[in-house]
Every structure is written in structure tokens, then in C-alpha cells.
Amino acid sequence: MTHQTHAYHMVNPSPWPLTGALSALLMTSGLTMWFHFNSMTLLMIGLTTNMLTMYQWWRDVIRESTFQGHHTPAVQKGLRYGMILFIISEVLFFTGFFWAFYHSSLAPTPELGGCWPPTGIHPLNPLEVPLLNTSVLLASGVSITWAHHSLMEGDRKHMLQALFITITLGVYFTLLQASEYYEAPFTISDGVYGSTFFVATGFHGLHVIIGSTFLIVCFFRQLKFHFTSNHHFGFEAAAWYWHFVDVVWLFLYVSIYWWGS
């Protein structure tokens, strides 16, 4: 690395892609074992291996960027393109769920009673918990933007305050969603309405948990002075992801909760 004549980071050999692939194999096999034989042993081994791989791989990335200085502007540009493509892939992922919902709701079959919501389904009131959830996520979008601007201006105190507020709102959203699921008058097995509702909102909830975890890591990194006003792609990626989660929820709220009810 001493005599490098280019701006790109030549990554050292790493075991983490191999252990990541192994953990994916164990998790998918473990799911099958759980579904068919009611044994969670293989699934737990897979999840543990996956968590350890993620922790150690991202630990290496933080060391290479923050402490060894390998993330030059050219490398950061590549990471930005990578994050943008990842978010686009997530948009297409959710497009499939919206497609399933609109396919079923715009032309309900005779089996559904020829109406939407299907006969016997009592949808949730969009002006109760779903509206509160919308307010919570919109507020978190404001606070993450406040945190980003504070970071760019070198205002460490306000950045930490705003980031903490965002994380708190993310956790609050998750708790509200869990209580809504617990009290819902229908289940995932209640036909196409139940399956599209719980799969779409459930995967969004999973993304909120992932985004909250991402932001918690950024919070602790900021406490350790890892970010500067012009070198903070880890936080920027988390902010982009959080805005994506916000926008997806708005589409979910308008489509499934409001129009779909």
C-alpha cells in the first residue's frame, strides 16, 4: 500500500464472504427444518453465524475507512453508487408487494365476494394508529435531516440530539406496529387481504428495525468521533436508507390503509 499509484482500495483477502454464504445456507436450510420438523437448531446456528459475519465485516470496513484512511473520494463515490443501486433494488422488491395488492384489489374475484376489502374482513381504521405511525415516521425524517445538516456544519451536540430523537421515533414506530398486529381483527391466513397486508407492512417493519440498527451504530460511532463534516458516508448511507423507509411507508399508508380500507 505504501507505493500505491491509484486512489482505489485494494481489499485484503477476507473470510467474511465465505462465512456469509455459509450462514445464508444454514438459515435457509434452518427455515426448512423449522417449518417441516419444528426444530430451530440449524436456524439459530445460521442466524448466529450471520450476525457474527455482519459484525466483523463491518468492523473491518470501519477500520479500513476511519483508522487506515483507505476510503478516498474515488472509493466513496463507488460506495455511493452501490448504496443507490441497493435502494433501487429495494424499491423493486416493494413494487412486487404493491403489484400483488393492486392486482387483487382492483379486480376482486368472486371468491372474495366481488368487493374489496373481501367479505368478512374488517380493515383497520386509517385515522387511528396508522396515522400516528405516519406522523412518527415523517417526524423522524425531519430529525434525520437535522442530524445530517448539524454534522455537515460540525455541530456535534445537535447532531447527537437529532440522531437520538430519530432512533427513539424508529423504536416507537416498531412498538406501535407490533401493538397494531397484536390487536388486528384479521391474520396473515385470512385470504389475499391478510397475506398482502401482513407481508407488505411486515417487510416494511423489518426495514425499520434494520434502519434503526444502522442509526444506532452511527450514534455510537459519532460518540467515538468517527465522523467529520466532510467524511461521513456511513451516516449518509443510513440517512438515505431511512428516507427510503419513510417514502415506502407513505405509499403503504395511502394504498393499503387508506384506499384499501
UniProtKB/Swiss-Prot annotation:
Its main location: mitochondrion. SUPFAM superfamilies: Cytochrome c oxidase subunit III-like (SSF81452). Residues 1-15, 67-72, 153-155, 224-232 are mitochondrial matrix. One of its GO terms (biological process) is respiratory chain complex IV assembly. PROSITE patterns: COX3. It is a multi-pass membrane protein. Its EC number is 7.1.1.9. The chain crosses the membrane at residues 16-34, 41-66, 73-105, 129-152, 156-183, 191-223, 233-256. One of its GO terms (cellular component) is respiratory chain complex IV. One of its GO terms (molecular function) is cytochrome-c oxidase activity. It is found in: Mitochondrion inner membrane. Residues 35-40, 106-128, 184-190, 257-261 are mitochondrial intermembrane. It catalyses: 4 Fe(II)-[cytochrome c] + O2 + 8 H(+)(in) = 4 Fe(III)-[cytochrome c] + 2 H2O + 4 H(+)(out). Keywords: Membrane, Mitochondrion, Mitochondrion inner membrane, Translocase, Transmembrane, Transmembrane helix. CDD domains: Cyt_c_Oxidase_III. Component of the cytochrome c oxidase, the last enzyme in the mitochondrial electron transport chain which drives oxidative phosphorylation. The respiratory chain contains 3 multisubunit complexes succinate dehydrogenase (complex II, CII), ubiquinol-cytochrome c oxidoreductase (cytochrome b-c1 complex, complex III, CIII) and cytochrome c oxidase (complex IV, CIV), that cooperate to transfer electrons derived from NADH and succinate to molecular oxygen, creating an electrochemical gradient over the inner membrane that drives transmembrane transport and the ATP synthase. Component of the cytochrome c oxidase (complex IV, CIV), a multisubunit enzyme composed of 14 subunits. The complex is composed of a catalytic core of 3 subunits MT-CO1, MT-CO2 and MT-CO3, encoded in the mitochondrial DNA, and 11 supernumerary subunits COX4I1 (or COX4I2), COX5A, COX5B, COX6A2 (or COX6A1), COX6B1 (or COX6B2), COX6C, COX7A1 (or COX7A2), COX7B, COX7C, COX8B and NDUFA4, which are encoded in the nuclear genome. Belongs to the cytochrome c oxidase subunit 3 family. This is Cytochrome c oxidase subunit 3. It comes from Bos taurus (Bovine).
